């Protein structure tokens, strides 16, 4: 089975809905985190096994801590490789972050955007690729504190690591938008103009939460939105939070469409939803919208992986 088209993250809350889907539906693949599923058993594992027989599987890590200082978690890597082998998955991605410092921090934290960090993360990625026996992809993360010691911007940092490690780039479109709004350092459209498009081989899209009453003002003002004039910003809520608990916002859909216009191939694209689940029909409609955008730009080559 090939990993291509539009997908939806597999969650235990959605298991019955996945299993009731008819053949040839809009959802073309699923994704799980090895930390959550490597040792899962019981009815949850039985249902997942059934879903994995129907859908190609992408594996997306949460806690390898590629930016951390502690040695890579070899047990986690072994579990990840075993999970991928069991379900014939050939795609793995991880976050550009760290989540340990003398203990597990239960969050994805940023590092300074420096040349030293580039070399550190790239070496750890090469180690992971050697262990798994495949090229992995690196995801841009949302972050809420910017280091004053950074010597490059976020997309320059991502590109430099991907080139140094010879890995793929996993674009999270919502994270690009959230960071652009929260920090005001890099217009999301400029990010997409500057990212190494030849390395982009996977995309996430998700919803975010707006932490300010000004959100209503934004919704009602057509001339206060991001536009294609690079560097133009709108009046915005004080803080956007990458929650994966809301429907995808229109501004993020616009950014995904712009990404498809920029990319030489249309990568597999997954909708993330982690809590606050709506009726499954609403999630399915969002996946259908991804598929429609992919079809709109189908003049470019469609990217796929054997999975």
UniProtKB/Swiss-Prot annotation:
It comes from the Bacteria. Belongs to the UPF0276 family. This is UPF0276 protein CGSHiEE_05645. PANTHER family: UPF0276 PROTEIN HI_1600. Disulfide bonds: none annotated. It comes from Haemophilus influenzae (strain PittEE). Coiled coil: none annotated.
């Amino acid at each position: 089975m090939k990993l291509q088209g539009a997908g939806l993250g597999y969650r235990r809350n959605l298991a019955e809905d996945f299993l009731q889907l008819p053949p040839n539906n809009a959802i073309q693949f699923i994704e799980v985190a090895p930390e959550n599923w490597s040792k899962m058993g019981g009815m949850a594992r039985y249902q997942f096994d059934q879903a994995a027989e129907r859908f190609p599987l992408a594996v997306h890590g949460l806690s390898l801590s590629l930016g951390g200082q502690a040695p890579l978690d070899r047990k986690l890597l072994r579990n990840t490789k075993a999970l991928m082998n069991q379900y014939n998955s050939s795609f793995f991605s991880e976050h550009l972050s760290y989540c340990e410092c003398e203990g597990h921090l239960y969050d994805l934290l940023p590092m300074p955007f420096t040349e030293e960090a580039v070399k550190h993360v790239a070496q750890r990625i090469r180690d992971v690729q050697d262990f798994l026996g495949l090229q992995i992809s690196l995801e841009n993360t949302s972050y809420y504190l910017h280091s004053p010691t950074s010597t490059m911007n976020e997309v320059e940092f991502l590109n430099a690591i991907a080139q140094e490690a010879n890995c793929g780039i996993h674009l999270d479109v919502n994270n690009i938008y959230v960071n652009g709004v929260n920090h005001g350092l890099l217009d999301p459209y400029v990010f997409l103009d500057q990212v190494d498009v030849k390395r982009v081989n996977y995309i996430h899209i998700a919803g975010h939460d707006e932490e300010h009453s000004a959100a209503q003002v934004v919704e009602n003002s057509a001339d206060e939105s991001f536009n294609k004039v690079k560097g133009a910003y709108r009046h915005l809520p004080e803080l956007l939070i990458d929650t994966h608990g809301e429907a995808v916002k229109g501004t993020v859909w616009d950014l995904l469409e712009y990404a498809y216009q920029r990319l030489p191939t249309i990568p597999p694209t997954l909708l993330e939803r982690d809590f606050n689940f709506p009726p499954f029909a609403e999630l399915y409609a969002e996946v259908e919208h991804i598929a429609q955008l992919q079809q709109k730009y189908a003049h470019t080559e469609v990217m796929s992986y054997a999975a």
